[in-house]
């Protein structure tokens, strides 16, 4: 591997850490209903953990309600159990044709908890970015040790890796701040 491909690989892996953070954030409940809220919930469907979206239609008729319409009658109770078991604090209402989830307004305490979770996810993303930096720097040092890279080039490449890291850590902070603001807005 040469210096360029190490830097490109590091950038790609840092992008993936940010994408994972965005997925985690999409599952965090704000005050509004969103289909992505139930995306992470798996239903034990015939012994296989299956995403709700693969066993039912998920719709958001208004900002305070999610409706789930299972394609299989047997899935009603399974979906209901899966939603209750999730840590989202949602209460499904099953009327036999459709499952409704009314999204109650968040309490101040719940908002603070969600803010903490958002910060935790952001911190995990930063750790992932820093781990990528460490791996890239180790690969660069191996190149230098094998005389494939001069000391000056090593220093320059490490500076580039640090700039990448700083950029992605700043991006993480920016996304975390936006998510916290969204959670705290009533």
Curated annotation (Swiss-Prot):
SUPFAM superfamilies reported for this sequence: Ribosome recycling factor, RRF
Coiled coil residues, start to end: none
Principal location listed in the UniProt entry: cytoplasm
UniProt GO cellular component terms: cytosol
Taxonomy, superkingdom: Bacteria
A GO molecular-function descriptor: ribosomal large subunit binding
Stored CDD domains: RRF (cd00520)
Annotated compartments: Cytoplasm
InterPro entries noted in UniProt: Ribosome_recyc_fac, Ribosome_recyc_fac_dom, RRF_sf
Keywords attached to this entry: Cytoplasm, Protein biosynthesis
GO biological process, one term: cytoplasmic translational termination
NCBIfam families: frr
Protein task: Responsible for the release of ribosomes from messenger RNA at the termination of protein biosynthesis. May increase the efficiency of translation by recycling ribosomes from one round of translation to another.
Family statement drawn from the similarity comment of this UniProt entry: Belongs to the RRF family.
Protein name: Ribosome-recycling factor
Organism, as annotated: Nitratidesulfovibrio vulgaris (strain DP4)
Gene: frr
């Amino acid at each position: 591997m040469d210096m360029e491909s190490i830097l490109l690989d590091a950038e790609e892996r840092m992008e993936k850490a940010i994408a994972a953070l965005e997925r985690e954030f999409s599952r965090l409940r704000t005050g509004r209903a969103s289909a992505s809220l139930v995306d992470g919930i798996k239903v034990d469907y015939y012994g296989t953990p299956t995403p709700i979206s693969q066993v039912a239609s998920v719709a958001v008729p208004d900002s305070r309600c999610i409706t789930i319409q299972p394609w299989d009658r047997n899935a009603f109770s399974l979906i209901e159990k899966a939603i209750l078991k999730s840590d989202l604090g949602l209460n499904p209402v099953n009327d036999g044709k459709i499952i409704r989830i009314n999204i109650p307004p968040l309490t101040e305490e719940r908002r603070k908890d969600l803010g903490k979770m958002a910060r935790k996810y952001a911190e995990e993303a930063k750790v992932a970015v820093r781990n990528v930096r460490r791996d890239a720097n180790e690969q660069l040092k191996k190149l230098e040790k094998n005389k494939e890279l001069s000391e000056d080039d090593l220093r320059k490449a490490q500076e580039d890796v640090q700039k990448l890291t700083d950029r992605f850590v700043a991006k993480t902070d920016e996304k975390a701040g936006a998510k916290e603001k969204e959670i705290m807005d009533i």
